[in-house]
């Protein structure tokens, strides 16, 4: 059913977004999220399967927007990363001050390396944002994809 809905809407939506698990389900295999060379091939295949104007994939290491004018979405990717990271660190009851603290966190070393390599490989057809370095003893892991989308949309609205 989701394929039928996607196919019916693909020509009228601006952004189609998914997380790493959904990407792997579409591709039918596990994906090494830190292998930039293989990721490039996987993301090209994924965008061929889902020919959205802009395809967004968000993972714990990096996020990417592929397609038509992807650089218009760089701030939205960052908004999604910061929002999901804030929820991960502070849970459901996070505040604007918590968000501001997380926004200042350094990026993850592994995520930055992959994001830079993907950006170089895709050139103008993609924009990437690395994930943040997150350290907490009590992570909130449920709902991070939805929280990413909320942060993405909130950043677009600003």
At which residue positions do the language-model features occur?
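Conserved phosphate-binding/catalytic region of the ribokinase-like
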Residues: 29-158
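Active-site beta-loop-alpha junctions enriched in small/polar residues
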Residues: 1, 21, 60-62
């Amino acid at each position: 059913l989701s394929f039928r809905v996607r196919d019916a809407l693909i020509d009228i939506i601006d952004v189609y977004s998914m997380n790493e698990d959904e990407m792997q389900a579409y591709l039918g295999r596990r994906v090494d999220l830190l292998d930039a060379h293989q990721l490039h091939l996987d993301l090209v295949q994924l965008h061929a399967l889902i020919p959205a104007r802009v395809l967004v994939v968000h993972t714990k290491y990096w996020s990417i927007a592929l397609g038509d004018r992807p650089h218009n979405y760089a701030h939205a990717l960052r908004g999604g990363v910061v929002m999901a990271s804030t929820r991960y660190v502070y849970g459901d009851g996070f505040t604007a001050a918590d968000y501001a603290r997380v926004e200042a966190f350094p990026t993850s070393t592994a995520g930055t390396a992959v994001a830079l390599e993907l950006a170089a490989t895709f050139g103008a057809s993609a924009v990437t944002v690395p994930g943040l370095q997150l350290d907490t003893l009590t992570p909130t892991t449920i709902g991070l994809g939805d929280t990413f989308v909320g942060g993405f949309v909130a950043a677009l609205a600003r």
